[in-house]
């Protein structure tokens, strides 16, 4: 029975306190009651904490998007994290592309130029996928986790104490209001006693909140170290990817390098197939100062390297008079020409000469 009485009294006291705070808050909003202002230093600390929370959330969320662009995958990882379970490993985009390239190259034939190149590209893409996975793991551990710990831990504590400070401030101002309205000596003495208690509780809560807020500077220093770790992880990732692509470029250049023009050279703009075949001797196609004469003068083009035999892999129908039609399994002579697009070679069969796509050829010697 005594316990029940205590609970009822406590409930009544809590309800009275809540009502008192609500009345004080409403009167302040209506300009009918005075409001105790926090000191400037504490206000600055509160603003700094709020600003830190807002930008930390934005940086954290956008970093998650950067590392995992797939929103469904992010939701799945979030659910597994809340269930305290490890998310199942999933193949990432570079790894999937790499596997497709390897499968395609195997089907086209590793002995063909295109098939060989696809397999090499696929292996490199899979290595990039592994590096991507390592970047995500390292960044999540060294960068995202500390940011999330601040949002879900430190800042929640700050917000809780800030709310308590707000309540203590309302209690203090309500006590001041009651003291002003007190007329009888007994009521005034009681109000003065209440004011001293609420003032003490407010000062104590303000000090607790201030100490917590001053830790924001340490949070910034910690997040700076985490940011350095993130930058280092990105630097390692991009350096790995650059090295992988550099090695791949060397491998791809090893078998057709003598017949591919420099990719940095200006490409020739192909003549559209809709143009008439009969082009005057004065007609020319030019890009950036590079001039290629009409098809009738193709034989006058200067070869930039020796000729070489190539076997045709597939039938090819010329799109216009500058190109040479091909039949599968026939052997033609090919050579490169200064300024020609890297995807093309000059082909020669008897008295016929024209551009041929390199992907349709297998170099023989």
From Swiss-Prot:
UniProt-listed InterPro entries: AH/BAR_dom_sf (IPR027267), BAR_dom (IPR004148), Endophilin_SH3RF (IPR050384), SH3-like_dom_sf (IPR036028), SH3_domain (IPR001452), SH3GLB1_BAR (IPR035695), SH3GLB_SH3 (IPR028503)
Membrane topology value: Peripheral membrane protein
Residues annotated as signal peptide: none
Keyword vocabulary terms for this entry: Acetylation, Apoptosis, Autophagy, Coiled coil, Cytoplasm, Cytoplasmic vesicle, Golgi apparatus, Lipid-binding, Membrane, Mitochondrion, Mitochondrion outer membrane, Phosphoprotein, SH3 domain
Organ and tissue specificity: Highly expressed in heart, skeletal muscle, kidney and placenta. Detected at lower levels in brain, colon, thymus, spleen, liver, small intestine, lung and peripheral blood leukocytes.
One GO-annotated biological process of the protein: regulation of protein stability
Superkingdom of this protein's organism: Eukaryota
Post-translational modification: Phosphorylated at Thr-145 by CDK5; this phosphorylation is required for autophagy induction in starved neurons and facilitates homodimerization.
Keyword Mitochondrion: yes
Residues where Phosphothreonine is found: 145
Pfam families associated with the record: BAR, SH3_9
One cellular component (GO) term of this entry: mitochondrial outer membrane
Result of changing residue 145 to A: Reduced CDK5-mediated phosphorylation and impaired dimerization
Primary location class: cytoplasm
SUPFAM superfamilies per record: BAR/IMD domain-like, SH3-domain
Sequence segments annotated as region (Required for membrane binding): 1-37
Domain BAR: 27-261
Keyword Coiled coil: yes
Residue numbers bearing the N-acetylmethionine modification: 1
Record's subcellular location: Cytoplasm; Golgi apparatus membrane; Mitochondrion outer membrane; Cytoplasmic vesicle, Autophagosome membrane
Coiled-coil portions: 155-195
Family: Belongs to the endophilin family.
Assembly and interaction partners: Homodimer, and heterodimer with SH3GLB2. Binds BAX; induction of apoptosis augments BAX binding. Binds DNM1, HTT, AMPH, BIN1 and ARFGAP1. Interacts with UVRAG; UVRAG bridges the interaction to BECN1 indicative for an association with the PI3K complex II (PI3KC3-C2).
Extra facts: HeLa cells lacking SH3GLB1 show dissociation of outer and inner mitochondrial membrane as well as abnormal mitochondrial morphology. Cells overexpressing SH3GLB1 lacking an N-terminal amphipathic helix show a similar phenotype.
Protein name per the record: Endophilin-B1
Species of the source: Homo sapiens
Gene it is expressed from: SH3GLB1
């Amino acid at each position: 029975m005594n316990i029940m009485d205590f609970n009822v009294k406590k409930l009544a006291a809590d309800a009275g306190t809540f009502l008192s705070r609500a009345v004080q808050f409403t009167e302040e909003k209506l300009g009918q009651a005075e409001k105790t202002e926090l000191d400037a230093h504490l206000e600055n600390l509160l603003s700094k904490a709020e600003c830190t929370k807002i930008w930390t959330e934005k940086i954290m969320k956008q970093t998650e998007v950067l590392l995992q662009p797939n929103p469904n995958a992010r939701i799945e990882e979030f659910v597994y994290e809340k269930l305290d379970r490890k998310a199942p490993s999933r193949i990432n985009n570079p790894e999937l592309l790499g596997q497709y390239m390897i499968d395609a190259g195997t089907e086209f034939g590793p002995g063909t130029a295109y098939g060989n190149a696809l397999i090499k590209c696929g292996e490199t893409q899979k290595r990039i996928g592994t590096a991507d996975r390592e970047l995500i793991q390292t960044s999540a551990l060294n960068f995202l986790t500390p940011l999330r710990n601040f949002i879900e831990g430190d800042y929640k504590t700050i917000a809780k104490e800030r709310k308590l400070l707000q309540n203590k401030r309302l209690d203090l101002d309500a006590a001041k209001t009651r003291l002003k309205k007190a007329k009888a000596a007994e009521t005034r003495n009681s109000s003065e006693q209440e004011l001293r208690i609420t003032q003490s509780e407010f000062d104590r809560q303000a000090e607790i909140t201030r100490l917590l807020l001053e830790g924001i500077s340490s949070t910034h220093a910690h997040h700076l170290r985490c940011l350095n770790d993130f930058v280092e992880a990105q630097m390692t990732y991009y350096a790995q990817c650059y090295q992988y692509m550099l090695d791949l470029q060397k491998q791809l250049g090893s078998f057709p390098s003598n017949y591919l023009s420099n990719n940095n050279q200006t490409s020739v703009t192909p003549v559209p197939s809709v143009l008439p075949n009969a082009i005057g001797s004065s007609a020319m196609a030019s890009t950036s100062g590079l001039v290629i004469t009409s098809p009738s003068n193709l034989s006058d083009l200067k070869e930039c390297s020796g000729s070489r035999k190539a076997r045709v892999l597939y039938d090819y129908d010329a799109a216009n008079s500058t190109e040479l039609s091909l039949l599968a399994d026939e052997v033609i002579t090919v050579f490169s020409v200064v300024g020609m697009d890297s995807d093309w070679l000059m082909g020669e069969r008897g008295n016929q000469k024209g551009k041929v796509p390199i992907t349709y050829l297998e170099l023989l010697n």
